[in-house]
Amino acid sequence: MIELAPAVHLSPRNWPMRASLAILGLIALVCLIGPLVSGHPYDQVYRDYVLARPSPFAHPDATETREALEGIARRMRLRVEASRQDGEVLHLALSADRPIDPRALRAFERSDVFRPARIVETRDAGRRLSVDVPLKRTVFLFGTDANGRDLFTRTLIAGRISLAVGLLASFVALTIGVAYGAVAGYAGGRIDALMMRIVEIVYALPFIFFVIVLVMVFGRHFVLIFVTIGAVEWLGMARIVRGQTLSIKQRDFVAAAEALGATAPAILWRHVVPNASGPIAAYLAVLVPRVILLESFVSFLGLGVQEPLTSWGVLVADGARNIQGSVHLLIFPALFLGATLAALQSLGGAWAAGTR
């Protein structure tokens, strides 16, 4: 007979769980859909907008337009004799000491500020040109980073990576921990003692040392991150499942299953693990934020995902390095990371309270 733990209901009184689920769902939805509609690839570099400030208004402003125009004129060895903006079009009068090659005007379309230029009038044997240059409007809600990449898109892509690592690493920890703890608790005796001594030995290993060794052996890879974290975090899960198994195997329905000739794997799968589902789910709800925090810490140390991919830990590390002049690089990733961790911690606490 299976006596499952009581279900956790989303009643109006359980508002912390409802609020946590709403926040997590919103963050996951934004991270999933946001990069598709932002208009900026996460790895695209805007050289004319390095460390641009966050703004809901479109770039370029007057200063950015002037600086971009001066840079192009310098590279083309031209003089800007007159400049007038009419709506979204910049009217320029250009001159040089020699005839201007029209192909040189391609420098405008290669910039992030202007669209392809159009020659309106040619004078003085090609040494003077009247040119119309449309402006290229771009919005950076969260600004740009030190490489000129859109921080809004990168923050949401980082959320995908961090959430994926949190879920996958927790799944690895769940799979290993439940199997290991159930076998140890059901076997008992010397097998249980030996298996739990192994757990204690692995517990004694420094987490960062373990990660560094694996990175040196296998290299930095996205899959390695959640495997490494999951291979460490299963230890706590194993202890919880082992304790539950020691209690459950003394129940009458387990003795009845043994008397009927059920095999040990069948008893564990059909009777022991289902009856331990309450504590397992509660621990899993607390484990996910821990895993995300560990991934952020590993990425902060430079052992996480590689460029051009990113995670919240990588962005927080970049923001910490540039906090003096560009605090927005730290604020936005930290807000997303903090909100996710707080919601997960609240969800785990509410779940644990509801399964008691």
Regions inferred by a protein language model and the residue ranges of each:
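Alpha-helical transmembrane segments of integral membrane proteins
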Residues: T144-R356
